[in-house]
Swiss-Prot record:
Homohexamer. InterPro entries: Pribosyltran_N, PRibTrfase_dom, PRTase-like, Rib-P_diPkinase, Rib-P_diPkinase_bac. Pathway: Metabolic intermediate biosynthesis; 5-phospho-alpha-D-ribose 1-diphosphate biosynthesis; 5-phospho-alpha-D-ribose 1-diphosphate from D-ribose 5-phosphate (route I): step 1/1. GO terms for biological process: 5-phosphoribose 1-diphosphate biosynthetic process; purine nucleotide biosynthetic process. SMART domains: Pribosyltran_N. This is Ribose-phosphate pyrophosphokinase. It is an enzyme of class 2 (transferase). GO terms for cellular component: cytoplasm; ribose phosphate diphosphokinase complex. The active site is at K193. D-ribose 5-phosphate binds at R195, D219, D223, T224, A225, G226, T227. CDD domains: PRTases_typeI. Mg(2+) 2 binds at D170. It is found in: Cytoplasm.
Amino acid sequence: MNGVKIIAGTSNKTLSEEIAGYLGLRLTDALITTFSDGEIRVQINESIRGYHVYVITSLSNPVNHNLMELLLTLDAVKRSSPKEITAVVPYYAYGRQDRQDKPRTPISAKLVADLIQKAGANRVIVVDLHSPQIQGFFDIPVEHLTAIPVLYDYIRKNVVLENPIVVSPDAGGVKRARDLANKLGCGIGVILKRRPEPNKAEVMDVVGDIEGKEAIIVDDIIDTAGTLVAAANLLVNKGVKRVIACATHGIFSGPAVERLTNSPIEKVIVTNTLPVYEKKFGKLEVVSIAPLIGEAIRRIQEGTSVSSLFT
């Protein structure tokens, strides 16, 4: 692909290499390292003048370091006379802080959007924002990709299902569950829950005809897995035959791996928007999001529809 440069951040270089490979490109020669005092150093070692530059950084842990790295890389690119700059952020951190749920708190998702634009991005590519409304925090084009087609394709090829039902772990994820259910040709269920404080959830009940079925719980993020495991236990108690979990972003914080390992969940399927390979455990299966992002980049460059990837 002519006229395109791909710059990889350090947070998920394997994914960046896969995306570049899909497009038949190599990664641009760039030095991203840390000074002895902890400051981030960015240096682009080849000309990018007049190119469409895609900077790929997933805002994984350490989140603040990777966010600052993204901003500095965008600034370095902006000062190098490119034709256009696209920030590719497979996992958009701070997305769960998208409103003031209590007095005197920041809207962190909006601030991150402002910083990315100020640093120089002309366009943003993201995958499964926690709240789709975050797109409205940007004043530049946002290509909001969804991993549902990728997860569906993997499930179809690798999981034998006789009588499935897709379950959303909360009311906010119903659209995601419906999209997957439509592809699988099955019904949906919804978990009703109350979250008393951050990172803790109390699962209440499930709406839907689930008895005797194979439940596929679908979510955007698996963090500490408390909600997910509680949902799985509830479904088993309500009579489902099997439980499979899938999500776009596998953070797996704190006790997540232990919880999932000891849970009734048979498989945990996530994409590689985050570098999950170091947290590999027996139930984990990882599917690459690179072809989806790569195809979106190709279509942007060709001026063809990106949204048709999901319809």
